[in-house]
């Protein structure tokens, strides 16, 4: 219900969803919690939180390095502990997880979904799991009332987009371009055709990700028919550039979010 409530409220005010991505435990768990609290205070619509992984193939260099920073002290137990703390801090904001398949399967699929439900998580996106393998997780997601998110890519066939639209719950992660994550000066591709196709198959909101780093990108995304954006690399870059000064980091994050939300 948290995603539904969020999108309904945004629609009433004719606003776009702005969802930041950060890696849990980057640069450490204490700062990570402060970063997430700053994001919430700054007025983000929802959270997309990553589990650090040694081989994050869908990510560009900025987020790869954030995984490496977090991996110095990361553990599944600490990730779950931080998720619980975030949920206790704010009972209303939707919390999405972005994880790589290996982490989920090595933990045990059903156990993982049961655990994140207990932590107050709302959705999961598995970065490197193709749609064809959805049956491996979908039963556990439904059983534990976790919304499973799937990715709509620019080169997907109409049939694949129909599958993505039909099976995604909460929202659909729509790629602004193919390749890996990373901030861009301009949005290279027009995703309006993909978004239009998705909306023909399902009313599930479509969020645009990959390359979102400026306010004008959000305006462009709105023009393409997107219901919101996911922003990761530009935000993670601020963390990377302020590792020696927590206060400066939090202030810059606040300023960045303030400049992006409208």
From Swiss-Prot:
Keyword DNA damage listed: no
SUBUNIT field: Tetramer of two alpha and two beta chains.
Key words, A-Z: Amino-acid biosynthesis, Aromatic amino acid biosynthesis, Lyase, Tryptophan biosynthesis
Pathway assigned in UniProt: Amino-acid biosynthesis; L-tryptophan biosynthesis; L-tryptophan from chorismate: step 5/5
Catalyzed chemical reaction(s): (1S,2R)-1-C-(indol-3-yl)glycerol 3-phosphate + L-serine = D-glyceraldehyde 3-phosphate + L-tryptophan + H2O
Organism: Helicobacter pylori (strain G27)
Domain of life: Bacteria
GO CC terms: cytosol
Keyword Iron-sulfur: no
Membrane-spanning parts: none
Annotated catalytic residues: 48 (proton acceptor), 59 (proton acceptor)
Role of this protein: The alpha subunit is responsible for the aldol cleavage of indoleglycerol phosphate to indole and glyceraldehyde 3-phosphate.
Matching InterPro entries: Aldolase_TIM, RibuloseP-bd_barrel, Trp_synthase_alpha_AS, Trp_synthase_suA
Molecular function as annotated in GO: tryptophan synthase activity
Name listed for the protein in its UniProt record: Tryptophan synthase alpha chain
Gene assigned in the entry: trpA
NCBIfam families: trpA
Family as reported in the entry's similarity comment: Belongs to the TrpA family.
